[in-house]
From Swiss-Prot:
Gene transcribed to yield this protein: rpmA
PANTHER family: LARGE RIBOSOMAL SUBUNIT PROTEIN BL27M, RIBOSOMAL PROTEIN L27
Species name: Herminiimonas arsenicoxydans
Pfam families on file: Ribosomal_L27
Listed name of the protein: Large ribosomal subunit protein bL27
Stated family: Belongs to the bacterial ribosomal protein bL27 family.
Coiled-coil ranges from the UniProt annotation: none
Gene Ontology biological process terms, A to Z: translation
Lineage: Bacteria, Pseudomonadati, Pseudomonadota, Betaproteobacteria, Burkholderiales
SUPFAM superfamilies given in the database record: Ribosomal L27 protein-like
Alphabetized PROSITE patterns for the sequence: RIBOSOMAL_L27
UniProtKB keywords: Ribonucleoprotein, Ribosomal protein
């Protein structure tokens, strides 16, 4: 006869992989055209001048230049722009 009872089971033990979201290039830093500025879910930050937005809301530079973050508008939205160097 077995001297130990059968081990229990658990319904946990899973976790999703991290998605590596966030700011990749900060204000004042230089970026090349096509470089990713922010990976995000939804439009936490909106695209400004010389910035494009991918279908997953990723913001990327359309030209070479310096990254700048600005808050504007009645809704106090945050925008990211690329100032050509």
């Amino acid at each position: 006869m077995a001297h130990k009872k059968g081990g229990g089971t658990t319904r946990n033990g899973r976790d999703s992989e991290s998605k590596r979201l966030g700011v990749k290039v900060y204000g004042g830093q230089v970026i090349n055209a096509g470089g990713i500025i922010i990976r995000q879910r939804g439009t936490k930050v909106h695209p400004g001048e010389n910035v494009g937005m991918g279908k997953d809301h990723t913001l990327f530079a359309l030209t070479d230049g310096k990254v700048a973050f600005v808050i504007k508008g009645a809704l106090q939205r945050q925008y990211v722009t690329v100032v050509p160097a």
